[in-house]
Amino acid sequence: MTRRWTMGPEWIAILALVALFVVGTVLPINMGALAYVAAWLVGMYSLGLDEKEILAGISADLVLTLIGVTYLFAIARQNGTVDLIVRTAVASVGGRVALIPWVMFAVTAVITAIGAASPAACAIIGPIALGFAGRYGISPLMMGMFVVHGAQAGGFSPISIYGTITNSVMEDAGLGASHLTIFFSSLAVNTVMAAILFVVLGGRKLMRLRMDADGELVEAGAATGSATAAGGSETRVHPDRSDARSATGATPTTGTPNPGDAGTRLEHTLTLLAFLAVAVVALVFEKNIGFAAITAAVVLSILTPKAYKDTVKQIAWPTVLLVAGVSTYATILTTAGSPEFVGNWAAGLGAAAIGALILCYVGGVVSAFASSTALLPVIIPIAIPLVAEGGLSAGFFVAALAVSSTIVDVSPFSTNGALMLANKPDTIDENTYYKQILGYATIVTLVGPLLVWVALVLPGW
């Protein structure tokens, strides 16, 4: 008698994920809305969950972070405070435009390395970095991804959140911690990816540009005649910003506005103090950055209610829906056992190296839609058979898993990628920027785990 094969819930959840991704890419429908539909149907009719259990999967933390941060920065953009930060930061690099992305990368890396959550660091630095991109003609994709890669570059230090989780899980599994191996692996991979982005997305051109005393872009060029004796010449550059406003509030035709163009000195001071308070509350006292940001925004609105009465409309509501829906469906995936199903299958393969590669891809693909923090404790124990029986180095294998599961946080469906999308410069259309981030995230998800595996696992360190 032939045994009849039935499709398990783990397969149904995986196929539904593929379907909603395809539909959301082909049709102009918010993928968060599609994810809610998929979560409802798969949850009720495949997993037998009721609606309360399905709704319990929504990541309220991520949603509140997006709402609070975009609300606060909408106020800062409206009163000119972000523009003030931009001018100050430009001055700190001596007007050398090419250094701006690397400064943002380094600052974000330091913040996560000393213990900040990756989304918290991206929430604080991302809008400021994208303000630079909108003002000075830097690729928004490069700038946004520099912030995310910076967060991951420092994200596995021994005292960081990711580093603490990863090494603790290794010790609990009897593998022994590999603090420096994991940290420097993540630092190296993300720095290399940032360097590639810098070259591909116009970084070499930025090296010829600087800001003059009036805040305008100038390009150094070879001098002739009497200018040669003076040591060179400069050509003023005019980026095409005729149809958009920058994220910092400058109009395309006015360049860098004067400090008094928007808001007052008191408003700027109060807003800067609000930024500082949010950073201290979130990073030092380890409170939720979403609550901190929305509280700061409400306090500023109470102090000047008429000025900010319409600011709430500038919250990135489409992005909020995107993250809320996808995070809910990610819980359905986990409940269905899809990650464990694929991971256990990979661990059961005969070749340890091939099993390791498959696990790296499982980590990358799942983390592109779900929480990296939640995934790491799940996927690392699955790798134990490959370490015990396959002769793989525990430190480098776990490093490969950790890096593969976090470099994909550039995805617009993850918190970090969504924060970049939510704070896009006004010089780029939201749909265009979404497609750029999605395209880059797709490349990273498809190629990144393979390259990480080749560098860290295949040599058999």
Question: What label would you give each PLM region?
Answer:
Residues 1-65, 73, 199-334, 338, ...:
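Hydrophobic transmembrane alpha-helices of multi-pass small-molecule transporters
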Residues 32-33, 116-129, 143, 157-163, ...:
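Transmembrane helix boundary and interhelical junction motifs in multipass membrane proteins
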Residues 20-29, 107-117, 148-156, 281-285, ...:
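Transmembrane alpha-helix interface/packing and boundary motifs in multi-pass membrane proteins
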Residues 49-135, 312-389, 397:
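Membrane-embedded alpha-helical segments and adjacent helix-loop junctions characteristic
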Residues 10-15, 33-36, 98-106, 120-124, ...:
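Hydrophobic alpha-helical transmembrane segments
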Residues 4-13, 59-71, 119-122, 166, ...:
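Structural signature of hydrophobic alpha-helical transmembrane segments
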Residues 132-220, 418-455:
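Membrane-core helix-loop-helix motifs of multi-pass transport proteins
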